[in-house]
């Protein structure tokens, strides 16, 4: 919106957020994040925007009077998607874009028959089951039920969004071949990749297009942003789960895969290993739908989010696809907004910068280069350090309030804030704290300055090893922070419930930003950009 580019963001209006994290006896405990308890003054309910989303059922094949094959998706379990709009205004522009989030609504709220029979739970069963779709962000997918809910969530918001987009195009009464000229859909990672077979279904089954025309339109409409280099993090769904939840889409994926593999076979005859790697349907460890492969095959471009990430994506993770379509792979480096992470979160520094170069830097960050001559001026340095000290004093108060630990504001604030994960290596950070603690105990203080190590982040509810790392952090902190021989030379604190609000306190106070993820695993590192 600040660039005056028109756009609409689609997603799910979750009733509860990721989760509210507390620490009890050193362990993470998850609580519902009731972020809507007081309502949301920015959103506008749109009850007139209600779309039917279908699950399950079966497909029925028939031939129409002209001899064309027709497929009907019948006996489905249906849910309504209702829109909530949030305006997103640009900074000092007249552009206001829209964030449209979908909330699940039951097609039938209440069964009077079951209620009159005294079966009160059964009376509201359908309502409860339907509205679970927009209940919680990222349900635990370590169980079959959790995985099924995630797949349903992804299809729910994708189907509603495409049903919202298509009528807007049809109002112009243009031919479908012009759809990609009017609509560009960016797939943010593989979570919405089911949009590819869904658009095919709508074009084939609802609007009666032939396969080749529908596929050409679909492929020219979508582009895919990849966010991870780790093969184990690339989303895959068991075929039997797909068959049960989205039987029509599975058939469409099979046909997409068949035609794509014929193309690969012509380009690389006799290379069965390549065919197996590039297939949308993976056979290893049970048949699975590879959503990243589907996203690549169904998109006109694929981008990484940093130059290194894009290079590794071409050379390693998707090398076979790059060899087939090198022109489709591009780099678009991620970024963060300076309006949020400098102008808003660090008003003291923002005021100092504006006093030196004026306010235009807020929407043109390149102007910060004009600060370079100030770096050698003692007066500017002193004012910069004053701002930093004020930010550290503010964070010190937050740390005391949230953890009970009193830290030294004159120490180096050594910060690692990101989700807790093995590849992000909070474990390495803790081992470094242990090493420094032992050196202090041994009196080896040469070149050492007082340091406060600050860690914050959440572990996925089903990720037991990440939770063990949180327990280790608190175990080490309990020893370090209560050892009088160490005093203010070293402190370790874990700030619970890392979120944007807490980040706005932590980031401006940071002296040292820890970016120690295993080499080659971090796609872009937007957290580093904020710091």
Regions found by a protein language model. Give the residues of each.
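A conserved ligand/cofactor-binding region detector
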Residues: 1-528
């Amino acid at each position: 919106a600040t660039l005056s580019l028109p756009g609409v963001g689609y997603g799910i209006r979750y009733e509860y957020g990721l989760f509210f994290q507390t620490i009890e006896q050193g362990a993470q405990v998850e609580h519902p994040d009731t972020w809507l308890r007081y309502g949301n003054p920015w959103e506008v309910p749109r009850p007139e925007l209600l779309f039917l989303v279908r699950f399950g059922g079966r497909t029925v094949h028939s031939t129409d009077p002209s001899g064309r094959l027709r497929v009907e998706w019948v006996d489905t379990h249906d849910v309504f998607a209702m829109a909530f709009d949030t305006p997103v205004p640009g900074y000092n522009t007249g552009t206001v874009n829209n964030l449209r989030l979908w909330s699940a609504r039951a097609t039938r709220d209440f069964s009077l028959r079951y209620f009159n029979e005294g079966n009160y739970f059964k009376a509201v069963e359908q309502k409860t089951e339907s509205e679970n779709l927009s209940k919680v962000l990222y349900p635990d997918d370590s169980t079959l039920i959790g995985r099924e809910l995630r797949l349903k969530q992804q299809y729910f918001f994708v189907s509603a969004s495409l049903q919202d987009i298509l009528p807007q195009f049809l109002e112009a009464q243009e031919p479908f071949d012009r759809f990609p000229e009017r609509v560009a859909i960016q797939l943010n990672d593989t979570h919405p990749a089911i949009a590819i077979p869904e658009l095919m279904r709508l074009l084939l089954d609802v609007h009666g297009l032939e396969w080749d025309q529908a596929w050409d339109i679909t492929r020219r409409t979508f582009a895919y942003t990849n966010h991870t280099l780790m093969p184990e993090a690339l989303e895959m769904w068991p075929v039997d789960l797909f068959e049960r939840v989205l039987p029509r889409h599975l058939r469409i994926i099979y046909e997409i895969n068949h035609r794509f593999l014929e193309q690969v076979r012509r380009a690389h005859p006799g290379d069965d290993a390549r065919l197996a790697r590039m297939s949308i349907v993976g056979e290893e460890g049970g048949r699975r739908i590879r959503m990243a492969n589907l996203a690549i095959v169904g998109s006109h471009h694929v981008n990484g989010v940093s130059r290194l990430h894009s290079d590794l994506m071409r050379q390693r993770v998707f090398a076979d696809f790059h060899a087939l379509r090198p022109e489709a792979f591009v780099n678009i480096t991620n970024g963060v907004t300076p309006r949020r992470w400098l102008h808003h979160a660090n008003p003291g520094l923002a005021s100092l910068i504006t006093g030196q170069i004026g306010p235009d830097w807020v929407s043109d960050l390149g102007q910060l280069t004009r600060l370079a001559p100030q770096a050698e001026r003692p007066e500017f340095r002193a004012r910069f350090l004053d701002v930093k000290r004020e930010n550290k004093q503010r964070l010190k108060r937050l740390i005391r309030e949230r953890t009970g630990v009193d830290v030294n504001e004159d120490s180096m604030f050594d910060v690692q804030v990101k989700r807790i994960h093995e590849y992000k290596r909070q474990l390495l950070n803790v081992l470094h704290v242990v090493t420094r603690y032992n050196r202090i105990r041994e009196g080896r203080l040469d070149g050492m300055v007082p340091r406060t190590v600050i860690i914050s982040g959440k572990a996925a509810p089903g990720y037991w090893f990440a939770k063990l790392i949180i327990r280790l952090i608190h175990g080490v902190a309990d020893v370090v922070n209560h050892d009088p021989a160490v005093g203010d030379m070293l402190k370790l604190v874990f700030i619970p419930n890392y979120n944007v609000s807490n980040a706005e306190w932590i980031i401006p106070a940071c002296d040292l930003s820890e970016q120690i993820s295993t080499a080659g695993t971090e796609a872009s590192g937007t957290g580093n950009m904020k710091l």
